[in-house]
Structures are given as C-alpha cells and as structure tokens.
Amino acid sequence: MKKFICIILFASLHLFCRAQNVFDTETPPDMEGSNSSLSSDSIPESNVPHFRHTWQWERNGVYKREVALDTLMDGIQNFNTIFKKNISNTYLGNFPSPYLSNIFITRETVQDFYPLTQIRAFLFKPEDALLFNTTTPFTRLKYFTGGGKGKAENLLDVWHVQNIRPWWNAGIRYQLISSDGRYMNQKAKAYHFSLFSSYEKERIALSFFLNQNNGHFAENGGVKDISFIIDSTNQKAENIPVNLSSNDISNNYRNTNFQLQGQYNIGNPKEVTTPTDTFTTYPAKAIINIRAEGNERRYKEGNIAFDFFPHTYIDSTSTTDLITNQVYDISTKFVMNEHPKYKYLPGIYAGLDFKHENYRQRTTFDSISHTESFGHTRYSGTYITAGIFNVDTNVSFTYDIAGKLCVLGHYAGNFKFDGYVQQALRKDRSSYIRANATIELQSVNPFFDRYVGNHDIWENDFKAIKTIKADGRYVNNRLRTELGVGIANIFSYVYFDTAAMPQQTSKTLMVLTAWGKQNFRLGNFYFDQTVYFQKSTQEDILSLPAISVYSHNYFQHALFKNALFLQTGIDVFYNTKFYADNYMPSIMQFYNQRERKTGNYPKLDVFLNLRIKRADIFVKYEHINYLLKNHGDFFSAADYPINPGMLKFGIKWDFFD
C-alpha cells in the first residue's frame, strides 16, 4: 500500500512538470536517429519546445563527454541491473544480491571501500550522475514488479530534473530495489536518494552531488543439498533447506557521497557550433574537485551457525562485525583546452591530487583473555597528474591519454597510465577502430591487509599489483557490428582461495578475451547477438566460462498509425561450464571452489513490450524453461541457484509538457 501511494504521489508531478529520458541508452537498430544528447520530444504539447542537453565531465572536469539519450523501450524487460552491465554473472540468484561478472574485462573497478565492489551496480555515485540543461522540467517514473505474496520482487525508480535558470539545473532521484527472495532467508533491499545540480554561466562552471546508498541482504548460505535443484522433485523453492536457516543473519551497508567541482575559464571566449549544440569555449581553465565518501559495512548473526562456519573466534553467541571508512579526495588541474580552429591541436593538462583514507575496525583479538580492541588505520597519497587529449567530434582521429604518479604518502610509487586512440573509417564516423590500454601499479586494497571478524581473521603484507591491459575493437554502426580482442596481464594477483582467505599468487595471470556483437534484421524481425570467448592461463585461481552468449530476438512493429509500438520476443542467456565461485556471507565475498562446475544451462525469458505515447509497458516470463521440468542444473554461484520461473511486468512513464 505504501508503494502504491508513493507511485500516485510521484505520478501526480506531471500536473506541474515535464519529463525526459536519461538513464537508459540502448537503441533498437532501426531508430539510431532518435538517439541524441540534444533532442526534442516528438509530441509537442507546449509553446516551449522540449530540448535537453546531457553530459558528464571526464577526468574530473577536463572535458565534456556528450551522453546520447534515447526515448526507446528496447531492453526495458531486462531490468536486473547486473545483466544490463554484463551478459553473464555469478550471483546469488536474487535481485538485488552481491555479484561477480563472468566476463573478466567488464568486472567492476575495485572500490576504495572494497566490500562495495561486489554490489557496485546497485550504487549511485558521483561518476554515474549526468549533468543537464533542459528547456522544460521532466519527471520519470519506473515501477517493475513480479512474483506474489512472500516472493515479490520490486523496483521503483523516480527522478525529476529541471532548470531553475537557463544556466542553473537541479535534480533529485530515488530508487528502491527490494525482494522477498524465492528461497528461504533471501530478503534483500538496496536503495538510494540523490540530489544533484549544475551551474554554467560565463567563466564559472559548478557541479554538486550529494547522496546516500543503503542496503540489506539476508544471508542463507546457499542450498544445503543441490539434489533438490538438479533432480526432479516437487519441493517448492521456499521449502528447500538452506545452510543458514536462521532469519537473523544479514549484511548491511551504507555509502554516502559528496562532490563539489568548480571551474574557472581563462582567456577570450569563442563561440563554437557543433551538430548538437552551440557553446562557448575558452583557451584555458582551472579546476578544483572536492570529494568526500563515507562507508559502513556490518555483518550480524543473532545465533552462531557452527555447522556452517569452520571458525568462530570472538563470540560464540552472536556476531557483529563492523568496518567503517572515510575517503577524502581533493584534486586541482590547469587545462589548456583544444583549439576550436585548429582541430588537431590537442588539449593538455597537469595537476595535483591528494587522497586520504581512514578505516575503523576491530584490529586485535586476544583468544586467551577474549578481549578485543578497535582502532583507526590511515592511508594517504599525493599524486602528480597530467594528460593530453583531442576529443573534438569533428575530427576523424581522437585520443585521450592520462598519467598519474604518487610521489608522497602510503601509496608512493603507485602509478597509472591509461587512454585510448580512435580512428574513424568513414567521413560520417559511423565506423571506426579503437584501441585502449592501461599500465598500472597499485597497492593492494587495505581490506586485504587486515581483517578481524568473528569467523574470519587475516593479516597480510602483500606486494603491489601490476596490471597491463590492452584491447582493440572494430565498430560499424551501419552494419550493426562490433568485433574486439583484449589481453590482460596481472602480476601478483590477489584472490580468495578455497578457504575464503586472501592469497597472492607469484604466477603471472593472463586473460585473453575476444568478442563479437552483431544485430541482424529481416523485415520487422531482429536478432541481436553478443558472444564472448575467454581463456585464463591460471585456471586454478581464476576460472572463467570459455563462451558466454546473450541472444536478444524480437519482432517489432508500429500499429494504429504509430499510436502503439509493439515488441515481442525471447532473450537467451548462456555460458559454458566452469568452476563458478562460491560465496562467504561473513565477509560478503566470492571465493574459489573446485568441487563442481556450473553452467551449460540456457535461461530463457519471453517478453512483450508496448509503447503507448510516453508510457512503456512490459510483461515477461523470466526463466520460462523452468516450467518444462521444474529442475535442472541452474546454479549461478556454486551453492546458489537462480530463481525459478516468475511472471514480471512493469511500466516506465515520462511526463512532458
């Protein structure tokens, strides 16, 4: 009832505001022309035409990257956040839940507060936010749901953005993902609330972001006996025994973000016109970026599960493990911008970054006196940064190359050089080749240095990790084709072994990847295919599926003089067998296992998507092949099956004037 009331309240905003599309960027292959970072609503209902300009600042303010938006419904039925980011994942079957991409090159960047790395897709952080300039306000409402009482799965996403003045924009966003879980003790929730704003007038540009992410995951330790899933039984999912039968075991997190960026433009202004915008540029600018982040992760047990956890060190009655962290980051840069007249004259910049981290956690435990102490561990680093770039959209050859070297503090000696070069193959830049590369030496995340929990204790002095990565791709938008290859060499790789303890290997880990994406069309039928091939040279520490496939097949057609847009089809997710990681609830991390392989099981979803004016509606049956025999080897993580079949539906509604 509360959710229904919230939906009505937010929907009523359309009586006094207007809306537009922002966060989804996937476009059906026949409608690329509607995808623009500066576009107008196709249904005029106001004397003021609706235009929107959206962008992000790259390299902490060095240059703008225009973010193309769309108003299409393709992919709305695939609303599980992790599968919008990666076509194959190891996860706990629930939405939301911790996850690990099975595609190595798309794995999440390690977060400063490491426990957040495995839930990154459910966080909204400053680097995810878009900046806006709109002629009219807008509101978007998304509500997706499935299951019934006791097994419901819901997503509510509401946001509103508007210009207060032509040069000043502000917005809010609220998202809630919740699930009762199909198996016992799987209740989960992830939600965030965000405020953001941007200001650009004459020589001054400002952007502001403030939000908080929260989450709660009940832990069940996976199913106790995999035969309940693999063999034919009539046992309902909610009655299948699990390893942690108590309903008072959970992981909880909180992440708070603040960012303020200021830019001051220097020199004589010059007006520049592009196909999508007209703007003013200056020869140079000075930038300051201030970021603060607060984190907390808490693991709780009301009663100790001695038969599941091999060790209990501190308290034999209950568990409360807590880690907190604060990150402060200040960066300054001086930028010489690209010259608007001489297209191939690059921009350059240099600056200083200062980063400070403070961890508070249990630091010692005396097993004889059973006393414990808590303390602070502090890390800091001062970095020199520099870069060169030419990202002018009117030239055929573009690049962005940056370097960062820590000269003072705990991270002294760490460095990172990364960038890309891209060459257009056609005058309209509809096809191109691109190469990306990264060389990095990074100290091991503090999470691996020391941890003292009720079930897990370690103290390590690991070497810094050196990473060399490169990939290249060929993209042809006219043929709807992408082909790519990549290689990653990692020296002193850190992982969790079969006992869920962190280890560092002396072997060089190499991962080879190749992929292809091809969208075929036959009349109104579309067949969008994505496939990844992978090979790890150290299968004993990193197992990956050799082949992963996402097949998106559908029929789409406009009816009733374009009043109704219809799309119906089937999605197939598949990967070959491999040793998928298992999951340890007490540290909220995935770890190696070599007891059994998972995979070689296609998951099929059938769907119907409809667009009626500005409302997108979908109905789908997820995991429909489960109905054929109600069993099978449909595990994701080693002890965690994916959900049985479920009917889901939802609506996405944009309000304009």
Question: Where are the predicted features?
Answer:
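Hydrophobic h-region of N-terminal signal peptides that target proteins for export
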Residues: 9-18
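Exposed, low-structure sequence patches enriched in small/polar residues
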Residues: 4, 136, 248-303, 318-657
